[in-house]
Amino acid sequence: MSWQTYVDDHLMCDIEGHEGHRLIAAAIVGHDGSVWAQSATFPQFKPEEMNGIMTDFNEPGHLAPTGLHLGGTKYMVIQGEAGAVIRGKKGSGGITIKKTGQALVCGIYEEPVTPGQCNMVVERLGDYLLEQGL
């Protein structure tokens, strides 16, 4: 299965039980910041934004004072899982980033999708990739 298929079929799909509700953007990005696959709507990000995200996985709390920046958008960092998941909020939407052994699984949402639904979609794929040694 191609990385693009994972994005299209497992991240940009309808949320279970909520037909028509889906993430607004998603991507799988290598730890080095290289894009493995992304939706057409995923924002163009700067290398320093990805570096900040990777630093926060290695040093939890690093982004808390400044916020998480991706594609020029600033998200307030909210409760995540140290070293495993970073969550951010901006207005009625937000972002979830799950770290696997080799990649970051990223999902961005807006209402009517809830933070919990975004977490479920992103973390389910991230957990699967971890189980596969990726």
Swiss-Prot record:
Annotated Pfam families: Profilin (PF00235)
Keyword Ribonucleoprotein: no
Entry-linked InterPro entries: PFN, PFN_euk, PFN_sf, Profilin_CS
Record motif Involved in PIP2 interaction, residues: 84-100
PROSITE patterns: PROFILIN (PS00414)
Disulfide bonds: 13-118
SMART domains listed in its UniProt record: PROF
Subcellular localization, as worded in the UniProt entry: Cytoplasm, Cytoskeleton
Protein name according to UniProt: Profilin-2
Organism: Olea europaea
